[in-house]
Amino acid sequence: MKHLLTLMEFKPHEVEDLLRISRDFKARYMAGEVYTPLFPGRIVMLYFEKPSTRTRLSLTAAAAQLGMQAVYTAPGELQIGRGETIADTMRVVSRYAAAVAARVYKHETLEEMARYSSIPVINALSDRHHPLQALADALTLWERSGRLHGLKVAFVGDVSNNVATSLAVVGAKLGWEVRLVGPKPLWNQKLVEELAEDLAKTGGQIYFTDSMNEVAGVDGVYTDVWVSMGFEKEAEERRRLLKPYQVNQRVMDIAGKRAVFLHCLPAHRGEEVTDEVIDGPQSAVWDQAENRMHTAKAVFAYLLNKRA
């Protein structure tokens, strides 16, 4: 049974396959073929412990466009909120649904869900990884640059978070140079070690730096909120630590005119990014958000073993 818990478990050619399927789905969509009913009448369970806009809606839209129905659930709506085990829950859900997409606080929850599931489990965000976002990021950069391999991308700010981690993973699979630009207390050198085998195969490079000048010459400048869900108690300390890493027009000028601006959203305007940048001519965030839907379709099709 193939799951999508992280992209680390996927080989480089499998990541490329997902992105090519995504591009094909988007081309069909843009040509007016919105409805591609590959899985008519099937059910996708969305299990969300955290609130969501893009992830929930993109998965719901993707399921509908493939002929499926998405059923949204939260812990308080299921017996799991009253003590039923994850194991028992997944054994039951596997009899009803074709796949489960789960947005959870702890990555270990996803691992346990997958352990007892006989249907694909998809990571819709955990504290450690956000693979659906990384696929949309890669598709967006491919569209904007015209290249899938050999890109240079700088992630600026909280380089320890799930979005930065998944960006590094997809970059390692595609032979990118990923520059993780942020304060030293947030560096995770273990990540580079974990991706060493893929980097050796693809010729990619990942490194940490605290210099904002390292955004020079990149294809994309990426940032995310300074205070992620679950870190509210550390809000003031994180804002103090990350204040020097705001993406403003000066940063984009250093990056150069070729660079596009990326943000997974929601954005805290005036903190990690200025209005001038996110609403500016180099911003690709709205294409990036749309691409969440097309890459979600690709993930469903890939894991359920059927392509358009």
UniProtKB/Swiss-Prot annotation:
L-ornithine binds at residues 162, 224, 228-229. This is Ornithine carbamoyltransferase. It catalyses: carbamoyl phosphate + L-ornithine = L-citrulline + phosphate + H(+). Its EC number is 2.1.3.3. Reversibly catalyzes the transfer of the carbamoyl group from carbamoyl phosphate (CP) to the N(epsilon) atom of ornithine (ORN) to produce L-citrulline. GO terms for cellular component: cytoplasm. One of its GO terms (biological process) is L-arginine biosynthetic process. PROSITE patterns: CARBAMOYLTRANSFERASE (PS00097). Belongs to the aspartate/ornithine carbamoyltransferase superfamily. OTCase family. NCBIfam families: orni_carb_tr (TIGR00658), PRK00779.1 (NF001986). Carbamoyl phosphate binds at residues 52-55, 79, 103, 130-133, 264-265, 292. The keyword Transit peptide does not apply.
